[in-house]
């Protein structure tokens, strides 16, 4: 040990003690460890008694090296204290009562401390060598099957191992299929282990342990994807593990078992995969991927519900409050996904930091949400077509447009992810530019300028003193009236209670408009340098979305009357009354120009038409009929391109679930360019749901499915906050890894943990009160109830099923896996662009680049 620099030992980095490979002593140590006395004591040079080491191992219950390392990782002089205590133990001490005795060398000066560090290093080095030597000699660790085989009174031939819950369910299902198919039952033993083996070696024990103790089983897929590794070799190792696990299950039954055949097929399918997703997305790609999903039907169509129930200021306030809650959620989870940017997405991180069943339910709930969002985007594109009365929109034409819009999203998602990113970027930047232009357009029209010179509108529709007849202006609607059909909203709940309910309703409505901002986390597995990309993309995305929403809502809110019956109603049961009000012109006398006319198809009022968009209504108010028609066509483009983001999130969620062994492994299959085409194709099959828009009688049922999609998003946001809080408190207990205050910490979100608590409480309220109007007298609707709480029901069913059939449990904070994925990213070097002040032109260019 004299060759080791003693000063270097004072700054350890492995389990608090620096370990170095002693190649010069490897042969001597191995040969020394091979000597065995009759009493089991081994004499080793360096005055270390391995008999004492063995007694420490037995006392601590260290069956393998992993348990040993986990026990000593947070204690600097653990072995020194234990060894000294054992060595100084006398007969008198053994006969005395059990009291904790501490035998330590007092730390008096620098040299004493250095000696203790060196002594601890020697003990740990010997212990490591001891474990390695016993592994080479096949130290057998008997499993439950082997113990009962040797020591059961019934003997090894008659004993049948009891089944756990998972095995019982599989056994029942196996017997059912066996009876149906006429397969003879030849059961040897009920065991998941190989009955031909007496026990398992240390290596096999580690393999089995890693698949049960680690929550996120996808250790391979949790690595940094761009890390320079031999993919073929690593996949060979994974397949070898799968084959070993399969061999254990195949030994259960001599005859055929359908369930075991299915498991064998799944294991073989994993062996065929050669490629995985690749990091090709830049900041601007990820940014526009989320923006493209947000700037769609949620803002430009369903915002009409908010205006009709809460008025202009209530709508603005509700959108702002919802934005603050979601901002807290995004900033919190950004910190977690930046430190550990794994390809399993937020489902995998939720499994790791909350519970396996929680991550399972969260992942499948989000997949259901995205799966329903795709046909919702496609069908809403066809709904806008009803605006054009001179176009014959037959069922065949509608089906053709649905096919066209669906095929567009599918083809784009099957392209190389970098090409898809460029397409999404062009579409997203176009949406941002159009949104900015519409803000200026609304302000110019409000000031009295436009096609024809007209009087300025100002804040006329915000001033309750300017109300006339049945036109009730004001910051809020006069009352919280769910049954208002253009009569002025005078029969509902008035006062502060009514305004509170109106604002709360807008907050629930706006969750659909903000759905999609979480897509930056799904793309973390395909982001170039995620520790820089994800925080930047998240902050830019939400800044653009929130600021754009506020200005868009404000600018259109000053140009429309919130009581116009052409806007979508919050309660769908009054669609017929609103249609009659439109025919009579009730609530439409506020318009400055009435030259924009057209037929209205009553059958489509319940789901919204081109007339229902507040921006189209505002343009018609100023007599800009051609402009209104053109913008309605732009809205078709907005919703059609949003389908790309919906299918992307749907396919990547399915891929992540497969990576975690929570979905069939076939969904892991990727093309050579890193596209999970099996997940894309399977997810796209559900776009056929959009064809129910062809049949007008089924539109109401489709509206229920769309509401399930939007309501489920709040559950996802709630899960993101909960995952971060568990991570936050677990990180505070791990003193041996990076701290949040460290300068090298990738991203530190502000005001924690209060920010995450605020987001968790807000999102939980969204989930609980999503369907509260159903409990108001005379407004119960079974379909509306299930559309509001259907996602929550699915989440609890998934969670309970996985909890019952699996082995999921909530881990203690000190047992959470804080290393998988993080350490690989720590070892990855990214090439960063040099940053400098530059000229004014370069600064301006940099500002524009940061925004878009």
From Swiss-Prot:
Checking Pfam families in the record gives: AA_permease (PF00324)
Which residue windows does the record flag with biased composition (Polar residues)? Answer: 30-41
Disordered: annotated span: 21-41
Topology within the bilayer: Multi-pass membrane protein
Segments on the Cytoplasmic face: 1-285, 351-357, 422, 522-540, 645-673, 725-755, 806-852
Q: Quote the subcellular location field of this record.
A: Cell membrane
Note the effect listed for residue 382 to K: In SSY1-102; constitutively active, up-regulates amino acid permease transcription in the absence of amino-acids
GO molecular-function term, one example from the UniProt record: amino acid transmembrane transporter activity
- Per the record, GO CC terms? endoplasmic reticulum; membrane; plasma membrane
- In the UniProt record, does the keyword Transmembrane occur? yes
Q: Which intervals of the chain form a coiled coil?
A: none
**Which UniProt keywords are listed?**
Cell membrane, Membrane, Transmembrane, Transmembrane helix
Which residue ranges does the entry give as Extracellular-facing topology? 307-329, 379-400, 444-500, 562-623, 695-703, 777-784
Tell me one GO biological process term.
amino acid transmembrane transport
The record's annotation in InterPro entries points to:
AA-permease/SLC12A_dom, Amino_acid_permease_fungi, APC_YAT
Q: Where are the transmembrane segments?
A: 286-306, 330-350, 358-378, 401-421, 423-443, 501-521, 541-561, 624-644, 674-694, 704-724, 756-776, 785-805
UniProt key word Membrane: yes
**Subunit-level organization:** Component of the plasma membrane SPS (SSY1-PTR3-SSY5) amino acid sensor complex. Interacts directly with PTR3 and SSY5. Interacts with YCK1.
What this chain does, per the record? Amino acid sensor component of the SPS-sensor system, which regulates the expression of several amino acid-metabolizing enzymes and amino acid- and peptide-permeases in response to extracellular amino acid levels by controlling the activity of two transcription factors, STP1 and STP2. Amino-acid permease homolog that seems to interact directly with the extracellular signaling molecules, but has no amino acid transporter activity. May recruit casein kinases YCK1 and YCK2 to hyperphosphorylate and activate downstream component PTR3 in response to amino acid stimulus.
PANTHER family, per this entry?
Answer: AMINO ACID PERMEASE, SPS-SENSOR COMPONENT SSY1
What family does the database annotate?
Belongs to the amino acid-polyamine-organocation (APC) superfamily.
Protein name per Swiss-Prot or TrEMBL: SPS-sensor component SSY1
Species of provenance: Saccharomyces cerevisiae (strain ATCC 204508 / S288c)
Name the encoding gene, please.
Answer: SSY1
